[in-house]
Amino acid sequence: MTKIDIISGFLGAGKTTFIKKMLTEAFAGEQVVLIENEFGEIGIYGGFLKESGIEIREMNSGCICCSLVGDFGKSLKEVVEKYHPDRILIEPSGVGKLSDVIKAVRDVQDEIDAKLNSFTTVVDVTKCRIYSKNFGEFFSNQIEYAG
C-alpha cells in the first residue's frame, strides 16, 4: 500500500528543503513520487528534484484543494497505477487550507491502494505574525490541521 504524506506551508517556509532532507534520510531507498502544486506555468522546483531521480507530477492550473479536486483524484490514481510507489509526497500550494487537501486525499484513498500517512506544515516563525494578519484563516488552518 502506498503511503501519502502532505507537506504544506506558505511560499518560502522551507517545504522543499524539508522534502529534500526527508528524501535523502527518512525515505532513502523508497520509490517516491512528488505531486507538487504551484501557480503559474512552471513548477518552481520540478527540474531540481527530477535531477535527483524523483518522479514529479506537476499541477499548475490551481490549488489541489479548490478547483482541481476532481483532477487531483484522477492524477493520484494515475500515479499509483503507473509508478506503484512506496510513498507519494504532496506539496500543495500554500494558498489553500490544509484541511481541504486532507479531505481531497481521504475522498480518493479508498479507490486506490493508498493510505494517508501524515500531514505536516512547515512554518517560518519569523513570518508568523504577518502571515496570520494577511492570510488569517488559511494560515491558521495549516497550523491547526498539521498532525
Write out the residue ranges for each language-model feature.
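Contiguous mid-protein beta-loop-alpha structural module that forms a pocket-lining wall or clamp
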Residues: F119, G136-G147
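Nucleotide-state-sensitive switch-loop elements of NTP-binding domains
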Residues: T2-S8, A13, T17-S132
